[in-house]
Amino acid sequence: FNAGDKLNIIYNSWNNEDDGVPLYSCLTCTACTNACPQLVDYDSYVDIRRTLIVGGPAAEIPHTVLQAVLAAEAEEDSDADFVAVEDYPIDSNVGYYPGCVDYLDQEMVFSHLNEGDMNLGDTTSAAFTLFEEMGTEVSYLGRDFLKCCGHDQKWQGLDEVFDKLKAYNQKKIEASGIDTLVSSCAECFRTFARDYELEGVKVMHTTEYLIENGFDMEMKVEDELTVTYHDPCRLGRQMGIYEEPRQLVAGVEGVELVEMEHHGEDAMCCGVSSMMSCNENARALRVSRMEEIRNTGADMMITSCPKCVSHFECLKFEGDERHDIEILDVVSFLARQVEAKKSLAEESAVTPVSAEA
């Protein structure tokens, strides 16, 4: 992660010497900023430069259909497709936004000729499993209510599209009456917290919300399990959330949490880069990360970002046995343990009927 190379990218783009292509090769993972002794925010420079590249990033984006569908939501004529505030069932001061997980699931199936079985949408039902067990009332602010948060559009330099999405969502969130907005998506969380101006609304990642509200279900795994945790760039380096996910995972009895060589502030990026880097360079990052996972001896890799899950699952679709490890969102992992605990309790509650002689 050479900050000098980042400066060369910015300089070349300014002078139109490369048509902006190297600029879009930057993952905006903040690793170079983290390593810079002067704490220069290189990502912000790249963000600004991207908005000035004529023609935008069309040549760099692989998932064009997905991006076109989400960008189309920014237009006013799509407003009628979303439920108005007064007609939406909001009965709590806490709202949960799922992000575009269902869209990502469909895109992965489409991209891999229907061979994929990824279910990012599970994080939503998993989150509400945890909320219910905690006795916490949370209102679901679905994608029939709010539009895409605009994360990818912003980082691709499509400021006009992002501003429209932001204006629509911001108005509805503030009108909803909630004072806390929760999301399990690291990118949505970072976008709402950093790039929106939500008056009177606290934005939290689900792991933060669980810890703050005393999540402790006294869970245990049936068989001892070794797991490792992958820090998403948006959640870790950009928002400083490292311990909450680890605390939740380590709180499950029978689970041993082991760290990869690069973790925390030094964690490797999965290479997703706002869905712009589905190429050999991004693949090389995932292959290296998979090697680090194998070296830990972990049975499972847990993370807190649907894009990270999708990118690692994408690598698994290649069928290489070296990459055959379960990848799971931390919220889904916890919900799995809650369901197992409930099933065990139900089985224990059944009193066997003794046969009469």
Model-inferred region functions:
Residues 1-146, 152-183, 189, 195-196:
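Iron-sulfur-cluster electron-transfer modules
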Residues 106-121, 126-205, 234-250, 255-357:
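Cofactor-cradling patches in redox/metallo enzymes
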Residues 203-213:
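A nucleotide-sugar donor-handling region in carbohydrate enzymes
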Residues 214-218, 236:
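Short helix-to-loop capping/linker segments positioned immediately adjacent to catalytic or ligand/cofactor-binding
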Residues 218-223, 295-296:
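Short, conserved loop/helix-junction motifs that constitute active-site signature segments
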Residues 229:
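Hydrophobic alpha-helical positions that pack around
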